[in-house]
Amino acid sequence: MIIQRVVLNSRPGKNGNPVAENFRVEEFSLPDALNEGQVQVRTLYLSVDPYMRCKMNEDTGTDYLAPWQLAQVADGGGIGVVEESKHQKLTKGDFVTSFYWPWQTKAILDGNGLEKVDPQLVDGHLSYFLGAIGMPGLTSLIGVQEKGHISAGSNQTMVVSGAAGACGSLAGQIGHLLGCSRVVGICGTQEKCLFLTSELGFDAAVNYKTGNVAEQLREACPGGVDVYFDNVGGDISNAVISQMNENSHIILCGQISQYSNDVPYPPPLPPAVEAIRKERNITRERFTVLNYKDKFEPGILQLSQWFKEGKLKVKETMAKGLENMGVAFQSMMTGGNVGKQIVCISEDSSL
């Protein structure tokens, strides 16, 4: 069977910005027969995420991410439907997901590496398993729970950078749900600012591309900052940290502004900002959601419940077609998405 797949065509270089041309589509032949334990799947949706920038380097800089190899198929979060099965627990028509889904129209995968999902948890929106009811949702929820130290009724202010992205848009809402009295988002367009305040319930939004970020933050957070959900790093984070209160907490989710720079993770703070952090006893600990696998199942159920109750609003930016994986990735890395960036590979007619 001839299928299409996306391979890594070139590396952007350690300090280069990724472009769509770093990827290419090619035809590939799948084996005709399945081995015991394997399933053939048709890909429905694929995810592009900031962490993938690290996988484009020969050395990802982290021990839990393997680099993509040149001329080899790329992979990431994906969801699809089983078309044929030689696995005991999976049958034709089952919907399955994996963090290591190859960027292919169809694939033959080891059934043990797949997780069956229930469409009812997402009211039939299967792509949500790659966003709000999936890894970004868990990252936001567990990050806020484990590193935010929020206690309801204690009048805490939370700031979220990259607030209109996959994790940021959820983290701000979760901050409110868990008891923050004020949530402020930082993003890069007026349209995104309006989206945060009018649709997601953020109390205020700061556009870092217009005006002085520090001044806008002072106005939006008159009582200082108690919890900072950091998706971006760099100058924006320095401005936030400078306004954080004593004994406050940074949730170190991502550093998208630094992923194309050859620096260690998490990147060190400038000396003046690091001095503020130490003086005010601000925690800034590395957060890796994969260390909390025991919390995944209850986390997914909590996120699903909030979504069904209308308390957690979900936003996606959807591209179509495998040939647009590189375009979608480049756009996501430069803030072109609102909410989770997804690529629809094929529609499913059985839903």
Curated annotation (Swiss-Prot):
Q: Where in the cell is it found?
A: Cytoplasm
Q: Under which EC number(s) is this enzyme classified? A: 1.3.1.48
GO aspect biological process, one term: prostaglandin metabolic process
| Similarity field | Belongs to the NADP-dependent oxidoreductase L4BD family.
Q: Pfam families recorded for this chain?
A: ADH_N_2, ADH_zinc_N
Annotated substrate binding lies at: F99, Y100, T288, V289, L290
Name the chain's protein.
Prostaglandin reductase 2
Q: Identify the enzyme class.
A: oxidoreductase
Assembly with partners or alone: Monomer.
Tell me which tissues or organs this protein is expressed in. Answer: Widely expressed with highest levels in adipose tissues.
* Cellular component terms per the entry's GO annotation: cytosol; mitochondrion
Q: Which UniProt keywords apply?
A: Cytoplasm, Lipid metabolism, NADP, Oxidoreductase
Q: Which InterPro entries match?
A: ADH-like_C (IPR013149), ADH_N_2 (IPR041694), GroES-like_sf (IPR011032), MDR_fam (IPR045010), NAD(P)-bd_dom_sf (IPR036291), PTGR2 (IPR037399)
Binding positions for NADP(+)? 165-168, 192, 208, 231, 253-259, 287-289, 337
Major location, coarse class?
cytoplasm
Xref: SUPFAM superfamilies: GroES-like (SSF50129), NAD(P)-binding Rossmann-fold domains (SSF51735)
Its function, per the record, reads: Functions as 15-oxo-prostaglandin 13-reductase and acts on 15-keto-PGE1, 15-keto-PGE2, 15-keto-PGE1-alpha and 15-keto-PGE2-alpha with highest activity towards 15-keto-PGE2. Overexpression represses transcriptional activity of PPARG and inhibits adipocyte differentiation.
As its record notes, the protein acts as a catalyst of: 13,14-dihydro-15-oxo-prostaglandin E2 + NAD(+) = 15-oxoprostaglandin E2 + NADH + H(+); 13,14-dihydro-15-oxo-prostaglandin E2 + NADP(+) = 15-oxoprostaglandin E2 + NADPH + H(+); 13,14-dihydro-15-oxo-PGF2alpha + NADP(+) = 15-oxoprostaglandin F2alpha + NADPH + H(+); 13,14-dihydro-15-oxo-prostaglandin E1 + NADP(+) = 15-oxoprostaglandin E1 + NADPH + H(+)
Q: Which GO terms describe its molecular function?
A: 15-oxoprostaglandin 13-oxidase [NAD(P)+] activity
